[in-house]
């Protein structure tokens, strides 16, 4: 299995998974801004894209999943009750799909959004905004369909994973090293909190510090309706 993070030098992470026996590939959380880069990489490496997977409906960027489905004929995979249109492969909690001989398993982890999932392959867990590495904590819960108490309660899903599993989150500062779940259990402040009240205080303070999401008014409608707007301010 080849596993690689593709978006160098930016905060939004995209992960490439390849079964080297069949040359089948999956992209997890591809970003529309880099669509051409993904296609170039797939073509230059002789890979067939089987799955474009979104860990949740994003508010900070436009997903490339529906364009990859349109252009390459792959499946667009999300949680079964997502409000995102364009999805043609819906998954349930603990469901597995196969990429060649590689099992890709989905673990429902709502809170940041109501459709959040952890995507697991052997050795790696792609957590979206459900869990970040170290002091970054977790994603904010004050965006559409986010719920603090639900997120807090969903942290119990982490008990399903081996401590040596590498946490590959949806956002990290460029150059951040992806660490193991066991390391995060000791060094991520959310995972050492004693109670929900502590978590609630952290979320409120984090939201105040972060402020608004500049791309939300463009990204959310695009991701719901699977349509690229005529004008994208940041492109």
What are these regions (language model features)?
Residues 34-77:
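Active-site metal-binding motif and surrounding structural segment of the metallo-beta-lactamase
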Residues 1-49, 85-172:
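Catalytic core of the metallo-beta-lactamase
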Residues 63, 145-146, 194:
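Residue-level signal for the nucleotide or nucleotide-sugar donor/cofactor binding architecture
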Residues 57, 172-173:
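Flexible loop residues that form catalytic
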Residues 43-45, 70-71, 143-144, 184-186, ...:
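Glycine-rich, phosphate-binding/catalytic loops in enzymes
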Residues 153-166, 173-235:
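Accessory terminal helices/loops
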Residues 1, 77-78:
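Short Pro/Gly-enriched beta-strand edge/turn motifs at strand-loop
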Residues 78-84:
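Short, polar loop motifs at secondary-structure junctions
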